[in-house]
Structures are given as C-alpha cells and as structure tokens.
Amino acid sequence: DGLKKDNFHITLKRTLHDGIKYYQIEELEEALEGADLILGGVSSFGLDWFCDEILPVLPEDVPLLTVTKGMVDLDDGTLVPYPHIFEQRQPEGKHINFNAIGGPCTSYELADHDDSHVAFCGKDMETLKFIKSLLTTDYYHISLSTDVVGVECAVAMKNAYALGVSLAVGLAEKRDGEIGAVHYNSQAALFGQGVKEMIHLLELIHGGPENIIHGAGDLYVTVFGGRTRKIGTLLGRGLTFDQAMEELQGVTLESIVIATRTARAVRKLAERGVVSLDDFPLLMHVDAIINEGA
C-alpha cells in the first residue's frame, strides 16, 4: 500500500522509479494479465509456498525468471539447484518455462541503476534471448547460459563462503577492539580459499568451470555488505551461533541454509569415497561453527 502511495520502498529505503504498478498477492490474477515475463523473487524460506500456491496458477505460455538462489541436497550428496526443484514440483501435466538469474547484483545498487552484470540461465537459448531483450539496459548487462546447474549452484554456494570470509572481519574487530576494523590480508586469504572450494564443488556437480565468474563475483559483493556479512562478523568476534542469531533476530539468513546443505552433501560424498573432507576446510569450519557449536 505504501508503494502505491508514493513509490517508497521501506526495505530498500529508496523511492522507486515511475512506471511500476504494485499489486497485493490477492491481485495476482490481475497482475498476470498481458504479462510477457514473470519474475519470482521469494527467499529460499518461501520456496514451499511458491511451489504450492503460485506455480499452479502461472500460465505456461509466459516464461518464468526466478531470482531465488539456493540448492537442495539429496540423500546421495547430489546438489540440486532451485530451478530444477521448481520444475519437479510444478503440477502434474504442467510445463512452465523455468529460467533463473545468477551473479553479483544487490537490489540496492540495481535500484540506483548502478552498472551490474548477471547471467540468465535456462534450458532454451531462444527464450533466454527473448528475456534478455526485455530486461537489458545501459546499466544492466546480461550473459546467457544453458548450464543451469553451473550458474545456479555457483551463485548459491557463495552464501556459505561469504559467511566464512566475513569471519575475518569479526576477528579483526575483536583483535583491535574496534568496530569496523579492517584487515584485508586475512579476508583475501579466506576469499581465495572459498573460490578454490567453489571450483571443486562445481567440478563435482558437473557445472561448467566458466561459471565461477558468477559465483566469485557474487561472493565478493556479498562479503562487502548484507545479512551474511553481519552473521559472519558476529561469529568472528567470538559470539556463539545462538548469540549471533539472537542479535540478528528477524533477519532471514539463507547463508545458514546453504552452508548446512552443502556441508551435509560433501560429508555424504566423503562417506562414499568421492571426495575428501580435507579439500573443504573452510566449508567444514563454517558448518562446525553453526551446527556443532565450535
């Protein structure tokens, strides 16, 4: 209702641009009328709701582009990106054209029309070209890929590793006794280790190695701000996971979900002899902090 009144977004703390129409969820049918493209932007915690309540009413002849980043781990250690989960959970007999966005692009800077580069991925290149033609601007730059697993898993992983890199921020603040203290050497060391482990994970899921550009870029921008940096910093200062979560009460933390699922998948693969846990020291350390009280 506030957006309808004055275009002011209370979370972004910005007045959005003219030409945008706003609808309540009860007005979904009206909003879909004449649409050329549908964008889905729920958090990973809204995945079940989106699958159960929204997918059944979406038209099949309009492509869907989702910004939800995440993976689900299966019993054998396989990591499945959300676009594949959406596809599996659409109503029987329905064939929605699923596509997704990956890459470093914060909502705040996009709202300010800051230059950004992302990847659109999906099964059909012609559909991707059509979507790109609708959304490309002089500040929003788009690459296309049919490697959905590679793109989406790369950008999902970064949430876990951004938490790991942010530990160095909290460690610096604890050592110096100063909030905002910065030590780039330690952050860079963890960043490099994170990218190394992400490359290894991409190999395991058979994602193209070229997709690391999207994951590494997303890792970079996530470390510099946002919810994941906050939780990593608090943990680095020495707070327990429960203490840190209490301080951030009400904040959605997808990094916790991704770190837990990815570590669990790696452990299962290690049990099968596919990988060694020694190849993922940063991921295992993050998992130990958030799930084992380390």
Feature roles, as predicted:
Residues 16-115, 131:
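Rossmann-like NAD(P)(H) cofactor-binding subdomain of soluble oxidoreductases
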Residues 16, 158, 163-169, 173, ...:
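NAD(P)-dependent Rossmann-like dehydrogenase/reductase catalytic/cofactor-binding core
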Residues 71-74, 151-152, 221, 251:
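Short, small-residue-enriched loops and turns at beta-alpha junctions
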Residues 57, 89-97, 115-210:
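Internal alpha-helical scaffold of NAD(P)-dependent oxidoreductase catalytic cores
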Residues 41-42, 122, 290:
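Conserved residues at beta->alpha junctions
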Residues 44-48, 142-148, 286:
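Glycine-rich anion/phosphate-binding loops
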Residues 1-16:
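Glycine-rich phosphate-binding loop and adjoining beta1-alpha1-beta2 segment
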